[in-house]
């Protein structure tokens, strides 16, 4: 079996039909892929829709569990996945009609550890579509369709959406790569750890995923205090990796660069709940600034840019003002 698609389900009765239809109507033999739906204790009618599909498709499996959150649901699906590759799909998104046709040649002929591709962002209210390249800037487009080490792609590709990647399952198993339970920003944490270990990432110049921008917003659409505290947790998780694993200088640079980005982002963030945000800063400001400066000094030598120098100066000024 080439591919396992893992779909956590929670409160998506408006969307899950389109998601499953987009997958199960692909031009591919059923034995070449499986769909694993993880019912994360959804209280709505989503699973009634899923059950109708299971009746007609033998390659659809359902896992039922109490609500544990997105990371745990993905991990549950990963545990039973039979495919050589795994693709984490959100239950309000979809894939293009030719997605399998575009991706399967890479899954069957080559043994890349990770496939990365462009996505189409779709506004729910207007239906407006925008293609977002996997690369951050046009100057990196020449890197399409050639294999790269993960550390080479840091600062060159988008890392905030895990759905735009397909992973070799044996690669994930080898490095014990799973999602960290209970945190927001689990995708960033996961992808950074992917970049640390992957020796073969293939960027594909093709939009293979439809990412829905929901009009009701999402956890990520506004800053909240959990978002802030979870970013501190991620920094400490990465600190642990640095202390426990024998990382190369470039692997350490990947972590330090992303720690710097988190620290800088926390200081320039704004929040609807001003008092809670100010309390968070009072408790964590010195740690954020000092850790950010340490990360900046390390990563500047690896990824020098005037922008990073300017941001580092901002952190230093904040520290001196105390």
Language-model features, listed with the residues they occupy:
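Glycine-rich, basic loop-to-helix element that forms the pyrophosphate-binding segment
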Residues: 65-81, 91, 102
